[in-house]
């Protein structure tokens, strides 16, 4: 006779339907977004000035940039990395260095600023 162990397959449990919570009231977008456009323009401001400022700049810059070449780009070495203002290099092995031990870090003197990465 052979020993039969407990099966590892279990029948799936029936799913229970959970009703979504009821809406308390209408959601107002001005509570959640800073980019809400007003329904009507202000009286002292004509409607033509409410255009996208980026679109207006493209039209103005079109004539000026036609005579100029492409804008110079950053050094080819730094193109893939965003510039954070901290110019720390990787360690000697090409791997990032561990952060310094907080107990060993000296506090900078007053009036003397140091850049720490």
From Swiss-Prot:
Belongs to the GAGE family. InterPro entries: GAGE, GAGE_fam. This is G antigen 13. Residues 1-117 are annotated as: Disordered. Residues 103-117 have a biased composition (Basic and acidic residues). This gene belongs to a multigene family expressed in a large variety of tumors whereas in normal tissues, expression is restricted to germ cells. These genes organized in clustered repeats, have a high degree of predicted sequence identity, but differ by scattered single nucleotide substitution. Their sequences contain either the antigenic peptide YYWPRPRRY or YRPRPRRY which is recognized by cytotoxic T-cells. Residues 32-45, 87-96 have a biased composition (Acidic residues). PANTHER family: G ANTIGEN 1-RELATED, P ANTIGEN FAMILY MEMBER 5-RELATED. It holds the Pfam family GAGE.
